[in-house]
Amino acid sequence: GHAIHSYLSNKTQNPIDANYVIFVAEVASTFNEALLMEDLLKKTNDKKERVFLINHFLDQFKGTLYRQTMFAEFELNIGRMVAEGKTLTADILCAEYKRLNEMYYGPDMVVDDEIAMEWARIPHFYYNYYVFQYATGYSAAIALSRRILNEGEKAVAD
């Protein structure tokens, strides 16, 4: 998705205008991926391949929409803690991260204690608050791709 977006952006715009922000990058790349997925699903008659593709789409949905939203909430919550004058320790970060995992995945999911440390290995958390853009970009891309697939040229023209 990102490769096609970057290629077309660089090919059709001057270098000064060809760059883009994260949200636009996510919309464009996941939009292209959604169109590709639809095309692959239409072309296959193989049941195993179809199951694989649907599973891949659902994994993307979980990872991009659900998990990134949890990441954004983690960042928001710890940012609020700092604003309230609290000192962030590893224990506080671990407790908050585990609490969110339990909340997001629900009581029927077994959440191992070790998940509490996962926050420490996620590179997104070493940069400013931006992961919410993955979820919002994905949502916009899926909505746009559905519209184009359902309405065709009219949606493209709009």
Where would I find each of the regions flagged by the language model?
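Catalytic Zn2+-binding segment of zinc metalloproteases
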Residues: 1-13
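C-terminal, non-catalytic "cap/extension" segments appended to globular domains
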Residues: 4-7, 23, 31-35, 42, ...
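Contiguous, function-dense segments enriched for cysteine-driven chemistry
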Residues: 27
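Short beta-alpha connecting loops at secondary-structure transitions
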Residues: 12-21, 53-60, 79-85, 122
